[in-house]
């Protein structure tokens, strides 16, 4: 039996013998092509040659190309792991001719390699050819069919439609008819019972396409028209993993030596055996596939991120983590540990894996740990929303809730949809998109500020007295009107102020300007051109009056607690993690603090606990504030003061000291550390390579955090009837819920079966079409099952239409047979139009569609409208 390495090498040797130049794989991540993020086919690196933009270097080439298909037309992500042959990253064995040979040689050599070199059984092979497209003036590919007739009987040469046999890289670009080679790997008994010709392109896991020969002769323009390419091109692609499956006598790509070494390591980590549990097997296949994609993307320079190609890689990584978390009990980072076995299986062919091993492991580990935190929060929130949705008798999650999970908690929409599908639900994507659009509009509006001219009342500069005073007398020096977010506001500069203007990460003070019987709200204080600017919602009646400028003392003290805590936190982090820790940024508000610092790995729970303990000791020591204003910077540095990231310092600085913590700082601070009360870390994450972020609360915020945890535990205990072992009680409850869910699903399945039998028994025929319908009360989910059962079991031309009343709601449903769809009928369009009769809307796919509405009296009319659109009675 040939190994994967031997198969890859044999392909290259064969085409080298046919005078092809063997070229290395292009990077999987595409640079410089606005139409592509990833290499999704072997021809991508030759696109400019095919279009005639650059001269060919060789007339014939062959290679093994790393490819990634997860977005756009070639979106295979949801199938990966659930079947035996779909992948995100895969290798494409390919040979090309640029204006040299064409169909005859391509077909001859494909046959020679498969049958004479690899010894595949020709009786198991089928070829498809393009049937033509009258709409585009394209005839059947009789030339290719004629060449295939030299090797295959006519019943092994099949016509294929435009979807299967006219290859296009995308909405625009090179394209042309193609000829697919399929192999039937079923047993002799199965082949005798059902011809392989009937299984081609029917998604049978053992009757699969292994090679696609594309006869590229057109370029698809942006307007959809076709133009001839400068020279005819042969572009072939053979799925390496599928070929290995066929040659190694396996029933799944994942059973070959391409994946099995990785799967065995995953199974060992999970303490299970591959092949013993369906859902665990799916999870292991997902992880084995995705680790390859992620590793190769990183070697090609694409790190996970929240934008474009980086987001795709992050999605794939998070999907794998989610499967490991849910089905293999992988609650800690584990995927980075798969790098050694991946290198063992693919390092020889792709040495870049070996060179980048340390980077790949580090990036994957950090991403895993970050997402595990997000996952726990997101799943918990989504579970709650699903329960609320089901309790309301609905199966569609509010799109705003899905957007909140995405926007606020970083929970990917595709994972939300996956979890919903597993629970028989879906998300309102239209509503989600609307929420996304509104957010973009808000961001645009927030960025636009219109400012008027300054009106000067007095000359002078503003003096800050807020280190010593919470309020003072003040007069307005100047003011101006601004317009922000369609609101009219005013900026005021005072001659002296206790208001701290936002700087150094500390937010600005809020408070009031008070004069006689008037109290003006100061909603923020910013620094513009080194001026403390007070933002107010309205101008005082008398702008020349003398005011009492008074800050919100409670919020100021909360800010001071958090700011002083960042100094103690900084010192504690250096003590626990090492002196390489340096502040890279901070954010201090009354509610919480954020502290960014240099560190090259996740701060562990144990390290966080040590940091909290150290900060707690410094708080309880009640160190007094030692403040040195206007100290020469050289003297401050001699004292051990640390200069902080992003700050500019003059010749004289302010030094803030608590015990052994000494920093240069212009912010406001508490008189003694004891006022902080306590500090609790509520989050730790990576914000950039080598930069970590800690989020924490202090004082009252820390108390509220602890109370919330206690309340949660009490609530859970109450829900679990105060069982002594909460975790065990919850586990039991989950198991019971799972059993109940299964019983409900069994009931719906059984009910669907009975309902289907009743509907089929009452079927009629109209214009040669079998007509099945239902109007009345029923469970919408059960009826959907009925629709798909009918499609699976009905070979004749048919239409199934249902008008369903379920829990005071009405649903219109339509399922069409394949032949009706090929004739041009589209269930989604028909249902969308008919839904007007029930005052609703909806749509769907060409085969199946649904619409919801509120006018139950119009159901029968809607059903009639559907039948009329189909052309039946």
From Swiss-Prot:
GO CC entries: cytoplasm
Protein EC: 6.1.1.7
One Pfam family recorded for the sequence: DHHA1
UniProt xrefs under SUPFAM superfamilies: Class II aaRS and biotin synthetases, Putative anticodon-binding domain of alanyl-tRNA synthetase (AlaRS), ThrRS/AlaRS common domain, Translation proteins
CDD domains (alphabetical): AlaRS_core
Any one GO biological process: alanyl-tRNA aminoacylation
Cofactor note: Binds 1 zinc ion per subunit.
Binding site for Zn(2+): 563, 567, 665, 669
GO terms assigned for molecular function: alanine-tRNA ligase activity; aminoacyl-tRNA deacylase activity; ATP binding; tRNA binding; zinc ion binding
Catalytic reaction(s) noted: tRNA(Ala) + L-alanine + ATP = L-alanyl-tRNA(Ala) + AMP + diphosphate
Keywords of this entry: Aminoacyl-tRNA synthetase, ATP-binding, Cytoplasm, Ligase, Metal-binding, Nucleotide-binding, Protein biosynthesis, RNA-binding, tRNA-binding, Zinc
Cofactor: Zn(2+)
Database matches in InterPro entries: aa-tRNA-synth_II/BPL/LPL, Ala-tRNA-lgiase_IIc, Ala-tRNA-ligase_IIc_anticod-bd, Ala-tRNA-synth_IIc_core, Ala-tRNA-synth_IIc_N, Ala-tRNA_ligase, Ala_tRNA_ligase_euk/bac, DHHA1_dom
Compartments reported by the entry: Cytoplasm
Transmembrane segments: none
NCBIfam families recorded: alaS
Note on domains (UniProt): Consists of three domains; the N-terminal catalytic domain, the editing domain and the C-terminal C-Ala domain. The editing domain removes incorrectly charged amino acids, while the C-Ala domain, along with tRNA(Ala), serves as a bridge to cooperatively bring together the editing and aminoacylation centers thus stimulating deacylation of misacylated tRNAs.
Function as written in the Swiss-Prot or TrEMBL entry: Catalyzes the attachment of alanine to tRNA(Ala) in a two-step reaction: alanine is first activated by ATP to form Ala-AMP and then transferred to the acceptor end of tRNA(Ala). Also edits incorrectly charged Ser-tRNA(Ala) and Gly-tRNA(Ala) via its editing domain.
Record-stated family: Belongs to the class-II aminoacyl-tRNA synthetase family.
The protein, known as: Alanine--tRNA ligase
High-level lineage: Bacteria, Pseudomonadati, Bacteroidota, Bacteroidia, Bacteroidales
């Amino acid at each position: 039996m040939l190994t994967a390495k031997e198969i890859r090498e044999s392909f290259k040797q064969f085409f080298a013998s046919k005078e092809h130049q063997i070229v290395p794989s292009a990077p999987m991540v595409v640079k410089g092509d606005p139409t592509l993020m990833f290499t999704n086919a072997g021809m991508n690196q030759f696109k400019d040659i095919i279009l005639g933009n650059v001269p060919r270097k060789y007339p014939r080439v062959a290679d093994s190309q790393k490819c990634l298909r997860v977005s756009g037309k070639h979106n295979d992500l949801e199938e990966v792991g659930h079947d035996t042959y779909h992948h995100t990253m895969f290798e494409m064995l390919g040979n090309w001719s640029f204006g040299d040979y064409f169909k005859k040689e391509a077909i001859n050599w494909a046959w020679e390699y498969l049958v004479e070199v690899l010894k595949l059984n020709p009786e198991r092979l089928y070829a498809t050819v393009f049937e033509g497209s009258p709409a585009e003036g394209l005839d059947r590919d009789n030339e290719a069919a004629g060449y295939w007739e030299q090797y295959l009987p006519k019943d092994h040469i099949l016509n294929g439609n435009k979807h299967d046999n006219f290859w296009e890289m995308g909405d625009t670009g090179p394209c042309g008819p193609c000829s697919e080679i399929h192999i039937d790997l079923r047993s002799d008994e199965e082949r005798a019972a059902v011809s392989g010709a009937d299984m081609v392109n029917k998604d049978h896991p053992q009757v699969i396409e292994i090679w696609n020969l594309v006869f590229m002769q057109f370029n698809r323009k942006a307007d959809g028209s076709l133009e001839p390419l400068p020279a005819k091109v042969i572009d072939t692609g053979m799925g390496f993993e599928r070929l290995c499956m066929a040659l190694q006598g396996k029933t799944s790509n994942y059973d070959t030596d391409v994946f099995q070494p990785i799967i065995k390591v995953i199974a060992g980590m999970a303490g299970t055996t591959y092949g013993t549990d369906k859902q665990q097997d799916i999870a292991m296949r997902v992880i084995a596939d995705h680790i390859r994609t992620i590793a190769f993307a990183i070697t090609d320079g694409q790190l996970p991120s929240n934008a474009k190609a980086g987001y795709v890689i992050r999605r794939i990584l998070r999907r794998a983590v989610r499967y490991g978390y849910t089905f293999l009990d992988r609650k800690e980072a584990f995927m980075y540990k798969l790098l050694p076995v991946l290198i063992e299986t693919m390092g020889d062919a792709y040495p870049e894996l070996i060179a980048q091993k340390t980077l790949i492991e580090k990036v994957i580990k950090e991403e895993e740990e970050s997402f595990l935190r997000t996952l726990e929060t997101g799943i918990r929130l989504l579970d709650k929303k699903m329960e609320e949705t089901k309790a309301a008798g609905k199966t569609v999650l509010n799109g705003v809730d899905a957007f909140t999970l995405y926007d606020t908690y970083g929970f990917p929409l595709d994972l939300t949809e996956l979890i919903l599908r597993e629970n028989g639900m879906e998300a309102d994507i239209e509503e989600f998109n609307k929420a996304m659009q509104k957010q973009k509009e808000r961001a645009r509006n927030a960025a636009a500020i219109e400012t008027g001219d300054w009106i000067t009342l007095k000359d002078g500069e503003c003096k800050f007295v807020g280190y010593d005073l919470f309020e003072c007398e003040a007069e307005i020096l100047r003011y101006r009107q601004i317009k922000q977010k369609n609101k009219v506001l005013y900026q005021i500069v005072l001659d002296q102020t206790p208001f701290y203007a936002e700087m150094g990460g500390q937010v600005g003070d809020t408070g009031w300007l008070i004069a006689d019987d008037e109290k003006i709200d100061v909603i923020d204080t910013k620094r513009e051109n080194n001026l403390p600017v007070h933002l107010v919602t309205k101008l005082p009646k008398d702008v020349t009056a003398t005011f009492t400028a008074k800050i919100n003392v409670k919020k100021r003290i909360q800010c001071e607690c958090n700011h002083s805590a960042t100094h103690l936190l900084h010192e504690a982090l250096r003590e626990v993690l090492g002196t390489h820790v340096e502040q890279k940024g901070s954010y201090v508000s009354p509610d919480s603090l954020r502290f960014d610092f240099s560190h090259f790995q996740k701060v562990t729970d144990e390290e966080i606990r040590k940091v909290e303990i150290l900060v707690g000791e410094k708080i309880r020591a009640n160190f007094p504030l030692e403040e040195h204003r206007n100290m020469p910077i050289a003297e401050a540095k001699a004292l051990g003061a640390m200069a902080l990231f992003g700050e500019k310092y003059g010749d004289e600085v302010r030094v803030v000291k608590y015990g052994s913590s000494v920093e240069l700082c212009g912010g406001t601070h508490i008189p003694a550390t004891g006022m902080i009360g306590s500090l609790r870390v509520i989050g730790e994450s990576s914000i950039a390579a080598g930069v970590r972020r800690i989020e924490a609360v202090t004082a009252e915020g820390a108390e509220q955090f602890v109370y919330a945890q206690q309340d949660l535990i009490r609530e859970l205990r109450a829900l679990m009837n105060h069982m002594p072992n909460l975790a065990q009680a919850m586990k039991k409850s989950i198991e019971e819920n799972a059993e109940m869910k299964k019983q409900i699903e069994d009931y719906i399945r059984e009910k669907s079966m009975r309902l289907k039998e009743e509907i089929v028994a009452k079927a009629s025929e109209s214009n040669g079409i079998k007509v099945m319908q239902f109007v009345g009360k029923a469970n919408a989910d059960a009826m959907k099952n009925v629709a798909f059962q009918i499609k699976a079991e009905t070979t004749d031309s048919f239409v199934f239409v249902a008008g369903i009343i379920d829990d005071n709601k009405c649903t219109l449903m339509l399922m069409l047979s394949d032949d009706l769809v090929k004739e041009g009928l589209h269930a989604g369009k028909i249902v969308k139009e008919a839904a007007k009769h029930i005052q609703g809307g909806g749509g769907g796919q060409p085969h199946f569609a649904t619409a919801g509405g509120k006018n139950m009296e119009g159901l029968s009319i809607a059903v009639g409208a559907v039948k009329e659109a189909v052309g039946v009675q």
